[in-house]
């Protein structure tokens, strides 16, 4: 009998992507995050769909509809908590996935990497518009502050802001369009993720050593399906612990108050996963400069392949680069902490130093470390 999964037009694609795919024999748990991100996306789309069935995108009823979901809809509280904390898990996996790419030199697959950066930006946009939907205080003021950044664009800035708002302030038109965007973007993310995978399968996966693994490949199933399943168990464990025991741990208490344009919260800040970028934005005492630094903090990922100076792909055997990588990680954690603090000393100067170090590490120190390691590997050294 002819094996259906190898001949059927649709099953053949699935087979080549997830079953008979040749994979390096030595990829570690750091390679789990791609599949975990796929699972996160599916969880978010499903929980989001059920939330959308009960949510109303109107300024008068949005806040009440979220309360109604949590109080009156069967398991509505669970669906909402899974969706809100699922976003945090999504970003946790995203940051680890990008970090893995930087550490092991996966960015040298340029198409895969660039699509990945576009994916990151799209997920960030989705999370931002989604945070506005409950129409709490932080939703409203977060939307006001972040959309206002567009006004820093010379000449067309103010027109652009009013175009995004659909009026002269964040109001009903803004909420309605943000809901529409929040509904459509995850499907665009799904399409981009498929393209991401398509480009990855053109080259095959990288591996911790950074050496071409073609001479030693194993089938994806059962070896990596079982490994991914273990990662999934951990993901679900953490997500359920968060959603069931401390669902509001990562949220802002201000969002329990309905949006009020006449009352500004004392500290306007985004969700934890945007705090590092928010800290960089605030560290420059100029509107346009801050916006450019904010954009640069993410878009810098696009030029990382151009800054690769080392003869070795991975950092596995490069201790100087490793040290700088972990300094960068600590620096990002510091920026995340600063982003959640009020704008006063000593937080201002710490934020400015951390922002400077962030760009210095990526643009100068890490490429120099690569060159130094090349020199140290020469036999005459």
Curated annotation (Swiss-Prot):
Instruction: Offer one Pfam family short name for this entry.
Output: Cytochrom_B_C
- Look up the domain of life of the source: Eukaryota
Report whether Electron transport shows up as a keyword of the record.
Answer: yes
Task: Extract the signal peptide range.
Answer: none
Keyword annotations for this protein, in alphabetical order, are: Electron transport, Heme, Iron, Membrane, Metal-binding, Mitochondrion, Mitochondrion inner membrane, Respiratory chain, Transmembrane, Transmembrane helix, Transport, Ubiquinone
SUPFAM superfamilies for the chain? a domain/subunit of cytochrome bc1 complex (Ubiquinol-cytochrome c reductase), Transmembrane di-heme cytochromes
Record-listed heme b b566 binding positions? 97, 196
The extra comment attached to this record reads: Heme 1 (or BL or b562) is low-potential and absorbs at about 562 nm, and heme 2 (or BH or b566) is high-potential and absorbs at about 566 nm.
Q: What does it do? A: Component of the ubiquinol-cytochrome c reductase complex (complex III or cytochrome b-c1 complex) that is part of the mitochondrial respiratory chain. The b-c1 complex mediates electron transfer from ubiquinol to cytochrome c. Contributes to the generation of a proton gradient across the mitochondrial membrane that is then used for ATP synthesis.
What name does UniProt use for this protein?
Cytochrome b
Gene that this polypeptide is encoded by:
MT-CYB
């Amino acid at each position: 009998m002819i094996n259906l999964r190898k001949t059927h037009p649709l099953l053949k694609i699935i087979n080549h992507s997830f079953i008979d795919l040749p994979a390096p024999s030595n990829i570690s748990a750091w390679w789990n995050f791609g599949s975990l991100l796929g699972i996160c996306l599916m969880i978010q789309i499903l929980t989001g769909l059920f939330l959308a069935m009960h949510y109303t995108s109107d300024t008068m009823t949005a806040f009440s509809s979220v309360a109604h979901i949590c109080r009156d809809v069967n398991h509505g509280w669970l669906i909402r908590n899974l969706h809100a904390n699922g976003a945090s898990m999504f970003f946790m996996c995203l940051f680890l996935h990008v970090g893995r790419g930087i550490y092991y030199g996966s960015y040298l697959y340029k198409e895969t990497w660039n699509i990945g950066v576009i994916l990151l930006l799209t997920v960030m946009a989705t999370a931002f518009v989604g945070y506005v939907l409950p129409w709490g205080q932080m939703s409203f003021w977060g939307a006001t502050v972040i959309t206002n950044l567009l006004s820093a664009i010379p000449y067309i800035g103010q027109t652009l802001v009013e175009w995004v708002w659909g009026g002269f302030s964040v109001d009903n038109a803004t909420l309605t369009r943000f809901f529409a965007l929040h509904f459509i973007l995850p499907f665009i993310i799904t399409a981009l993720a498929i393209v991401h995978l398509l480009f990855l399968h053109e080259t095959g996966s990288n591996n911790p050593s950074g050496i071409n693994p073609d001479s030693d490949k194993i089938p994806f199933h059962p070896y990596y399906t079982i490994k991914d399943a273990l990662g999934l168990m951990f993901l679900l464990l953490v997500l359920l612990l968060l959603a069931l025991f401390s669902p509001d741990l990562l949220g802002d208490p201000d969002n329990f108050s309905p949006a009020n344009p006449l009352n500004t919260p004392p500290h306007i800040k985004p969700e934890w996963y945007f705090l590092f970028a928010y800290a960089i934005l605030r560290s420059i005492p100029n509107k346009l400069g801050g916006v450019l630094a904010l954009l640069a903090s993410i878009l810098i990922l696009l030029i990382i392949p151009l800054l690769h100076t080392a003869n070795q792909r991975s950092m596995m055997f490069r201790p100087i680069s490793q040290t700088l990588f972990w300094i960068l990680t600590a620096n990002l954690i510091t920026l995340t902490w600063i982003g959640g603090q009020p704008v006063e000393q000593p937080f201002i100067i710490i934020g400015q130093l951390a922002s400077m170090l962030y760009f210095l590490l990526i643009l100068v120190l890490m490429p120099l470390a690569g060159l130094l390691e090349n020199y140290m590997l020469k036999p005459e050294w």
